[in-house]
Amino acid sequence: EDPPADVALLESFTSQMFAGRGTYGWGRSWEADVHLILQWARLQPKILYEETILRDGLEGCRVLVLPGCDVLPRDVVEAIRRFQASGGVVIGDEDLCPAIRADYVLKIRRRTEKADADKAALQAQAEELRQWLKSCYSWPVDSSEPDVVLRRRVAGEAEYIFAINDRRTYGDYVGHHGRVMETGLPCSATVRLRRQGGVVYDLVARRQVVATCEPEGLRWEVQLGPGEGKVFLVCPREIGGLQLANTPEAPVGGRVCIDVRVVDREGRDFPAVVPIYLGIIDPAGKESEGTGFYPACQGKLSARYEVAPNDLAGKWTIRVQELASGQELVGHFVVR
């Protein structure tokens, strides 16, 4: 799940109606460009609406971004003022509702239809914002490269870091128009996670990653090919092994129970959602229904296989692989 958001961006319906602002579902507006600025500043904003603020308030939020918010309802303005008075940071633009005074003002920039120039300008604004925020904000996860876009999710004691390579250049397809950079380029970055210790696994490569513990958190290196993305699992302990228990035999029309445990080196259930590949293979070597990818929540997975009337009799194989460290286990059952 997404962690509680400490950065939020308001999409104002009132400003859409009375000032002609808003994205209307497209990515060509100033509001959409502000979202890109936040992304390249390595922030993870949550989208808020006026009714969200009125219903839930702004508790837990540290930074509130208000692009294209020329006109706001009085009660929303009052909520934002209370947020700011309690220490919250407000980032606005040159068109911000005059009843609110922003702590930082983004200069509105219109697209030039030159993709490389527009991206460079927005990334420059992102870097200026980063430098200003350093005095009042601490990044939960950060990247040394703006083109490595990060997103953080959590499950119990574990954190999941998504890293996507956004470095691109003009290609041979539509690049000559200068509006789209459609060819990906490789990119490397250092990722830092504000966490004291832990073990890092690359869920795409299915292996452990070398990570360094530093005073400000956990650090590791990421290499991404053109257009490539990776998911990293960060957890408090190493995976120790797999355990498999299953029904030893079942008649046609019966049921096979398959229980998988992912454990640490002490044999305790692993405190994370670990992706599992489960293969159910008949005596002829063909994968059966039920084969696929499953989550082992807090290290546990329980699956059931219903033996079909036309399934082959004989010795079946269960193949289990956890996709963090790549460990595998094989079991069997007999269909009578």
How should each PLM-predicted stretch be described?
Residues 230-234, 313-324:
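Short, aromatic- and glycine-rich surface loops/edge beta-strands on solvent-exposed regions
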Residues 242-246, 292, 327-336:
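Edge beta-strands of extracellular beta-sandwich domains
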Residues 304-312:
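Short, surface-exposed loop/turn segments at beta-strand-coil junctions that are enriched for proline
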Residues 276-293:
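Short amphipathic beta-strand segments in non-cytosolic proteins
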